[in-house]
Each structure stands twice: as structure tokens, then as C-alpha cells.
Amino acid sequence: MLGVARMQKLFVLAVSILASMPGLRASTLLQLSLNDMIRQSTSIVRGKAQLAYVAQKGSVIYTHYQIQVSATLKGTHATTVDIAVMGGVANGAHQLVAGAPELINGQEYVLFLWTSKSGLTQIIGLSQGLFRISTNSSGQALLRRAAATELMLNAAGQPVTDSDYQMSLIGLQTRIQDVLNGAAK
């Protein structure tokens, strides 16, 4: 069985290779459970997104967003976080990466983030690590993520179907503490 760090490196490498291929529009996602994302994330934050800039690094175009952090659920607190999402338009070149999330300016999210050794911070699992926040009629914050439409494989390499995901922010905070304290498997 592959270790978490090795699986994460292989996933990032595979997505980077796929993204660098001109004209390629398909992605294959490694299915991550909520507990996987909690464990593998270097930080989990709640905040509002603002488009910052687009830059090319090697053959990959990244769209950068500035996240105005209102709460840190895991990791070291910062008031802002710069995140990079694969894909965008730079120097007249358009690069589309299937499975890469699109953030909306001013929208509030919970983001599961991973920072590489080079300092590049990305959403873990592409769209899997991005949850949109809304409020229900009683004022409770709810997190929602639509099912990924891209091909998704489990850890054994078998195709699986993703599903929509919804939970309360309070439920997520409890789950994070349980996972980090070893109470959740």
C-alpha cells in the first residue's frame, strides 16, 4: 500500500504531466475521502476569494487567487493566502485543466490546501478540496461541493463515481479535530 505522502506526490506529478500536454482536456482524479483531505492538507482555511493574477511556470499556466482568511481550521493562521489553480490564460495561451476548480470573486469557501516544498499552495485534489459556503434558514453555515465529473479512481486504481457532498461547518470542525486527534479512521 502506498504511503499518503507518496500517493500525494504521484497525484501531483500525474496532474502536472497531464496539464502540460497541449490540447489535453481530460483529467483523472484520485478519490480522496474527507479524512484523507484533512490528513494530507497542510492547512484548511475559511475565506473569500479574489482573483489576483495569472502566471506561467514552465509549461503550466496557473491562475492565482488571494484568499482573505476569516478562520484557520488547520495549520498556521495567516490573514491572506495566495493559492494557485492550474489553468488560465497567459501570454495569449489558454490552458484548460479538467477538474481544476473555478473560484468566484467574493465567494466564501472552505479550502483544503497543500503547499509544496517550492512554496506553491494549491487546493488538494483539484475540485475535491473546495467547498462553497452558504447559510441555511437558521443561519448555520453549510459546505457544499458538487460531484466531480472527471474520471475518478480509488486507491486501488478502480473507477469510482463521485457524489455531491454537503455538511455543516460545525460538523467539519468536529471532524477535523477527530481526525487530527486520531479519533477518526
Positions of predicted regions on the chain:
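Transition segments tied to proteolytic processing and entry into folded domains
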Residues: 3, 10-11, 17-185
